[in-house]
């Protein structure tokens, strides 16, 4: 956490996915990495806001930030194999758990990093402005 700007950088992310029987390991890795990248967005950047008339304020990629490879940490992934009894090859869908699990994992890591300031909860997205305002309120901003 940058105390001067409030920017949060995820430096390392470890994820283990239960893939069932793996048919193509490269596709599985790509799905997990893609799911994790899609989880970084709602955790740190993506917020849908509306104006007083109910119109979406950030309705284009010019003003709606989606993370790129530059914002993604070093992924450390592994797989466990528990064959699905509901598929003839024992395969399972993969990547979705990373998308769903990443935002709360990142939020918990940020709250833990700020716990020495008495922080116990932050709503996502955990934007730099939110973090900087919190640091300022706690007297910890640079």
Where does each model-flagged region fall?
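Cofactor-binding beta-sheet edge motifs in enzyme active sites
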Residues: 1-142
């Amino acid at each position: 956490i940058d105390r001067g700007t409030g920017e949060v950088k995820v430096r390392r992310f470890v994820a283990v996915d239960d893939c069932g029987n793996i048919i193509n390991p490269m596709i599985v890795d790509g799905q997990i990495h893609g799911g994790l990248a899609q989880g970084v967005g709602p955790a740190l950047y993506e917020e849908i806001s509306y104006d007083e008339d109910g119109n979406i304020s950030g309705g284009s990629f010019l003003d709606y930030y989606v993370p790129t490879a530059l914002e993604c940490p070093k992924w450390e992934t592994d797989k466990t194999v528990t064959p699905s009894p509901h598929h003839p090859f024992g395969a399972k869908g993969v990547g979705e758990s990373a998308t769903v699990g990443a935002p709360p994992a990142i939020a918990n890591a940020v709250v833990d990093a700020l716990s020495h300031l008495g922080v116990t909860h932050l709503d996502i997205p955990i934007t730099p402005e939110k973090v900087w305002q919190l640091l300022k309120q706690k007297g910890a901003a640079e």
